[in-house]
């Protein structure tokens, strides 16, 4: 089970510049009938200020930072994360391209190889991580759309690349 509380604030300083501040609290309880290693209780907190600037009708940029804290209430795992992310988006007629890059520093104590540790770290590793992505969406005609995405991450020792392509037809 999960309970969540959110407080989000936003303000347009001009027609081109917006600031948002997203805050959340989550209480997560997971219970498995087969594996006791999948039983856990987590309290998570996140605060994330974000600035968005629209350069033109087609181009906008975002810069955000996030502070996350995740605590296992029935165990020893504890995570404090600082995330700095920048993104750029371009849209024109039937084409949209979005790219982002994040520096993520995970200060983690506990077993990061456990199910709970992996869930708390969102698949990343303790310490410094870099994550990036590029997404392209192209409408071929009124009922066919092409989506291509590329994601990468580096946690120090090895870089991982993931790509996908999808053709979607709506009838």
Predicted segments, located by residue:
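Exposed, low-structure sequence patches enriched in small/polar residues
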Residues: 1-171
